[in-house]
């Protein structure tokens, strides 16, 4: 019984950590894109054209 509960807790913890990491990564990317757009609109356009 305790082993089962422990496995569930471990799985929940891993899921929570993974979700948190993904959430932070998305926020970080959005913030960085927003900063780039505000500061350097011309270079961002050049980068898009080059790609």
Swiss-Prot record:
Keywords: Host cell membrane, Host membrane, Membrane, Transmembrane, Transmembrane helix, Virion
Disulfide bonds: none
UniProt signal peptide: none
Localisation per UniProt entry: Virion; Host cell membrane
Stretches that traverse the bilayer: 11-28
Highest rank taxon of the organism: Viruses
Cellular component annotations (GO), alphabetically ordered: host cell plasma membrane; membrane; virion component
Cited function: Minor virion component that plays an essential role in virus infectivity.
Subunit structure as annotated in this protein's UniProt entry: Interacts with GP2b and GP4.
Family statement: Belongs to the arteriviridae ORF5a protein family.
Name listed for the protein in its UniProt record: Structural protein ORF5a
Organism: Porcine reproductive and respiratory syndrome virus (strain VR-2332)
